[in-house]
Amino acid sequence: AELPIAYSEGFSPHMLLSFASPLGVGISSTGEYFDMVLAEDMKTDEIVKRLNATMVEGMEVLSARHVPDGKASKAMSLVAGADYLVQFREGKMPEIDLETKVPVFFALPQIEIMRKTKRSEKLTDIRPWIYDMKAKKSGVWMQLSTGSVSNLKPELVMEAFCKWCGVELPPFAYTILREEVYADIGTEEERKLVPLEALGEEVE
């Protein structure tokens, strides 16, 4: 793409590029973000044009934004949420009335699962990390906590939901699409999620 990307200093220079929240294996997305440092200013639409001219099939850069100096790393550390659309594959839809069950499940005061860590397993209440949840045609939409502080996988939510419904899913019963990644610009008392794109601005 011939972008003037900046490199780190030292014996093993590398491009100053990082992803906001790496996508899990087997999950597709329409809302991924990465941060790169350029050695010189460029128009944001030109960045998009150059990247898409050399992009691999199946991937497209939708927009580019300039984040003021000193705030790029902060922007990445602000990652706090993500939207996911879980859709059951054809013939894999369980006998669950999603329109009825999903709101009741989301209204539960506590949702405990056995969560595996590197050293052990422990009972964890994941309800505080489920920000929103709605039934969709042949699936479930959810907004979950994402980031370094608390990172909840949609697979765990579906596992807990189906167990609560008394249903056991076969392997590869659904697909997962991540639609958006958010930053939290609120306070400790009140969460305020905005798309990462909103942290920057276009350069013309």
Sequence positions of predicted segments:
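A short, aromatic/hydrophobic, helix- or strand-capping loop or linear motif
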Residues: I5-S12, V61-V67, I111-R119, P170-A173
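Short, charge-patterned binding micro-sites
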Residues: A6-A39
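Short amphipathic beta-strand starts and helix->beta connectors
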Residues: H14-L23, A64-S73, R119-A135
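Ordered, amphipathic secondary-structure segments that act as subunit-interaction surfaces
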Residues: T30-L85
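Short beta-strand-to-loop capping motifs
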Residues: M36-M42, V86-K92, M142-T146
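Short amphipathic alpha-helices in soluble, non-transmembrane regions
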Residues: T44-M55, I96-A107, V157-M158
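Extended, positively charged loop/linker patches that create polyanion-binding surfaces
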Residues: K71-S73, A80-S120
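Core RNA-modification/binding signature centered on pseudouridine synthases
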Residues: P103-E204
